[in-house]
């Protein structure tokens, strides 16, 4: 079966392409690098010829609210139109658990808009919502650090390995469209501060993790269950303590990336607008240089 993976060169996409090929499928890694651009429509018609399914794990290259909305709406419309013309019978999209509970962020408003476009189309579909990845635990610490303290809300957290995300998406893509949403998460529930504390300890990082009821998660106010899936979620196999011993853990610890699809500029604006109400998780006077030099935060969709 031919399956086209949009965003096929990213963290999840590259793993997914490998897994699909191991199962004997013709998996096409589609991205601007390979001449396939969903935002402009370039290369889509040719790439989708003969495809039975399309999996979209792509992400916006810009993190401004208007740019993110434009990316997801435009690319999804282009993709769905091309799929209709090519006769694709299964559209799979990777989204985020709790998106509808985090509409304070323009990114999640855009993800909901993407989901709504998919639901309104005539193409059978499956939306896979995943929890945060183990690979980005360090990024959560980095963006929540002041001095030597990491301040985080003491809320439930059910992260999973990126490899398990790719496996879950692959199983859905190879199956029958559910015409609905599938949630996937890790095999264990933790408290957010607990996961970060364990990760930093494993990486011999001396920062102190503090559970702060007033702390926000990337500038977003979260409640007890904002970040966890429902009880019927499909669970990955990799436990956090096991993952911490793997090469992926060491690579994640060494990487300077931010781990959630909320741009630093958004966090800065939230803090500047509500300084007295928020914990000091960023310098008191964020500068343009800081915004420009920090890598783009991401919940790696691709």
Language model: regions and residue ranges:
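Terminal hydrophobic/aromatic helix or amphipathic segment near a protein terminus
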Residues: 181-233
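Glycine/proline-rich active-site loop of Rossmann-fold NAD(P)-dependent oxidoreductases
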Residues: 135-147, 172-182, 205-207
């Amino acid at each position: 079966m031919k399956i086209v993976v949009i965003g096929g060169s990213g963290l999840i996409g590259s793993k997914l392409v490998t897994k699909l090929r191991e199962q004997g499928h013709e998996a096409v890694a589609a991205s601007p690098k390979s001449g396939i651009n969903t935002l402009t429509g370039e290369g889509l018609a040719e790439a989708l010829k003969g495809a039975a399914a399309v999996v979209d794990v792509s992400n916006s290259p810009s993190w401004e609210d208007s740019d993110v909305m434009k990316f997801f709406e435009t690319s999804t419309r282009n993709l769905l139109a091309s799929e209709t013309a090519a006769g694709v019978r299964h559209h799979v999209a990777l989204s985020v658990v709790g998106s509808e509970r985090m509409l304070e962020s323009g990114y999640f408003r855009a993800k909901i808009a993407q989901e709504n476009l998919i639901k309104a189309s005539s193409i059978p579909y499956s939306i896979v919502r995943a929890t945060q990845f183990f690979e980005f635990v360090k990024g959560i610490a980095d963006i929540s650090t002041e001095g030597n303290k990491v301040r985080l809300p003491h809320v439930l957290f059910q992260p999973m390995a990126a490899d398990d995300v790719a496996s879950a998406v692959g199983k859905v893509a190879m199956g029958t469209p559910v015409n609905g949403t599938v949630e996937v998460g890790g095999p264990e529930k933790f408290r957010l501060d607990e996961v970060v504390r364990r990760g930093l300890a494993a990486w011999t990082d001396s920062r102190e993790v503090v559970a702060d009821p007033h702390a926000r998660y990337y500038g977003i106010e979260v409640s007890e269950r904002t970040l966890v899936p429902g009880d019927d979620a499909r669970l990955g196999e990799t436990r956090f303590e096991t993952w911490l011993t793997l090469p992926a853990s060491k690579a994640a610890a060494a990487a300077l990336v931010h781990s959630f699809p909320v741009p630093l500029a958004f966090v800065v604006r939230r803090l500047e607008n509500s300084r007295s109400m928020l914990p000091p998780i960023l310098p008191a006077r964020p500068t343009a240089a800081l915004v420009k030099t920090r890598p783009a935060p991401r919940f790696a969709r691709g």
